[in-house]
Amino acid sequence: KTQLVTFRVPLAPGENYLRAEAKSLSRVRARPWQMVVDFEAPKPKGKPDLYLYVVGINKYSNSKYNLNYGRPDAEAVQKALGDKLKLGAFEKVHVSGIYDLEATKENITAQFLKFSKQARPRDVFVFYYAGHGRTLKDENGNPMFYLVSSNVGALDQDKTVKKGGISGLELINYSKKIRAGKQMFLFDACESGSVAKAFARIQKDSGGHILYA
């Protein structure tokens, strides 16, 4: 059975790399189809905007998981990048910081969605996270990174982490929703190396970058 699906894709000036990939209900992937579209558009007036989103957690709902440097590191990154990048490179710098007990899954998600409605293809988006991280097995037995939000009360319970944390797959989906043509994700969290593979395709196809420590 053949089904035709239509998508509207916003194009940025210059080369745009488009890739389509289908998979069956049993998760068997078809050979991907890809093409390059060279879009000639009027040069946008003015400079791009920067969207800087920082999350740092020292205090968790379960105090035995509290950290010492999550929030200070995030605040330092916010100040350093926010101040430095205001110096002429961007038209506007939009900064959002969520810290400690305010950094719930719901609040973190809400800010991603807010920026997804504001950023334009010519803009730049930077996300920085400092806090706990866990890598668990997904339904196919593959490693999946979870950003541990402040309302996760038990790091040693996989179901609790999956319910209250934000998975690498969710982060990828937020990245796709945010239309900024240049994106960078930085993670200062345990076990965050596994998220690099999850972001590999975006990194290749859309000019995104991921750093982890």
What are these regions (language model features)?
Residues T2-P10, V28-F39, A74, Q78-D123, ...:
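Functional beta-strand-loop-alpha-helix junction segments that form "active/interaction loops"
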Residues S61-K79:
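Glycine- and acidic-residue-enriched helix-capping/strand-helix junction motifs
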Residues V36-G56, K79, D156-D158:
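Low-complexity, Pro/Ser/Thr- and charge-rich linker/hinge segments at domain boundaries
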Residues A20-S24:
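Conserved structural position at the C-terminal beta-strand
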Residues L52-S63, E91-V95:
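Acidic/histidine-rich, surface-exposed loop or edge segments in extracytoplasmic proteins
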Residues D49, E106-A130, R134-K197:
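Caspase-like (clan CD) cysteine peptidase catalytic core
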Residues G56, L81, Y99, I172, ...:
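Active-site-proximal C-terminal subdomain of hydrolase catalytic domains
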